[in-house]
Design a protein with these regions (language model features):
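Glycine-rich phosphate-binding/hydrolytic loop that grips phosphoryl groups
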Residues: 184-215
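DPxDG-like acidic metal-binding loop motif
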Residues: 61-90, 95
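Phosphate-handling active-site elements
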Residues: 48-55, 84-93, 105, 206
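Surface "functional belts" at beta-alpha junctions
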Residues: 22, 34, 89-188, 217, ...
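Stable alpha-helical structural segments in soluble proteins, enriched in small hydrophobic residues
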Residues: 46-50, 85, 103, 191-202
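N-terminal beta-alpha supersecondary unit
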Residues: 1-64, 188
């Protein structure tokens, strides 16, 4: 099963194609340009270089959230459009579950962290053992202080991954919670991990139509919060 995956949840943008656990091609860009300018050229570039077309894909996956509101909207909209154009199913992947796959080899707890501002992070915690991941919490927005209290009670080794990893690491260290950062080349979210997580979901039947694919924000955008006041 060939899966094209898109990752636009933070500053960087990436795309990858995976087949049966093997990465066939991938592209990554972190140049400060908007995702609306860079995503589709990356998709076109990797497919062309791998001598693939959209018709060769069996499903389109995307990091559906949480993450940057604008980034998630762009990624989900692109995935919906691509899936609809070639009449293929879509797979919405948790940004946090995907990034946990970066360090599934690191036995212990995997703490996924994205900066959600206001002293909070988007977070999920997994247990990694022998390359397998077990989810311990739901995706959530949590105060760093509350996360520190949770982690103090758990003696297992802790690896932090995600674009908010440094923020989380510094806070936990100051709170006397032993932890470590994921290696630099694995700390950030990427489309390859989105594709690998999508394979697991597809095997469980978690396919959806382009029309049904929806972003997952966890909390309202700033503009919506202001309208509600």
């Amino acid at each position: 099963m060939k899966i094209l995956a898109l990752e636009t949840s933070a500053k960087a943008v990436s795309a990858a194609v995976v087949e049966n656990g093997k990465v066939l091609c991938s592209g990554y860009q972190d140049t400060g340009l908007t995702h609306s300018r860079t995503l589709m050229p990356i998709v076109e570039h990797i497919l062309k270089n791998a001598d693939l077309t959209m018709a060769d894909m069996d499903a389109i996956a995307v990091a559906a959230g949480p993450g940057s509101f604008t980034g998630i909207r762009i990624g989900v909209s692109a995935a919906k459009g691509l899936a609809f154009a070639v009449a293929k199913p879509a797979i919405g992947v948790s940004t946090l579950a995907a990034m946990a796959r970066n360090v599934a080899f690191a036995d212990g707890l995997v703490i996924c962290a994205m900066d959600a501002r206001r002293s909070q992070i988007y977070n999920a915690v997994f247990e990694a053992k022998d390359g397998h991941l077990t989810r311990l919490t739901e995706d959530r927005a949590i105060a760093l202080a509350d996360l520190a209290e949770e982690m103090k009670a758990d003696p297992r080794p802790k690896t932090i991954v995600g674009d908010g990893a440094r923020l989380c690491f510094d806070f936990l260290q100051n709170a006397n919670v032993p932890c470590r950062l994921a290696p630099p080349h694995l700390v950030m979210q990427n489309a390859m991990s989105v594709a690998l997580e999508a394979e697991v979901l597809a095997a469980d039947g978690a396919l959806t139509s382009a029309q049904e694919l929806q972003p997952v924000y966890l909390r309202p955008a700033q503009a919506e919060r202001l309208r509600q006041k």
